[in-house]
């Protein structure tokens, strides 16, 4: 059914939207790599060394440096369809709070990244309310804010922060 297909879950193949094999933009994958990527050596292999002892010289020699927290564990949850629409953000936030669905929040995520948002959404919309509830439980939220381009081409005037960044 449609409801089953819309249920957020770990995505084993986050680049499977387009039939040409090039993915659908890869924004979430890119953000995950920035946050917790291992890094890629000059010969194209995954870096498997000790991050605490990684020297500046070694880092400069890498094709892609490691993310900010390369030893972090990630729970990747797709909330957007292939063309950018979603009705499952709240279900995804429920999953962040209780990944195995057993009602025990002790296994919740420590941080949630929401590289998404909308303009002009009220601060009391369901997503913002959930973000505030999660904060009270100790979940730190990082959300997109003010990056919806400029207003009518007027210089450096950029959009305000909509939901969920205005939580």
Describe the residue ranges of each PLM region.
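Subtilisin-like serine protease catalytic core
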Residues: 1-88, 104-110, 123, 135-138, ...
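Sequence contexts marking disulfide-bonded cysteines in secreted/extracellular proteins
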Residues: 16-18, 95, 156
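Hydrophobic/aromatic-lined pockets within catalytic cores
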Residues: 36-40, 97, 149
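Well-ordered alpha-helical segments embedded in enzymatic catalytic cores
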Residues: 88-95, 126, 130
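Short, well-structured alpha-helical segments in soluble
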Residues: 93-105
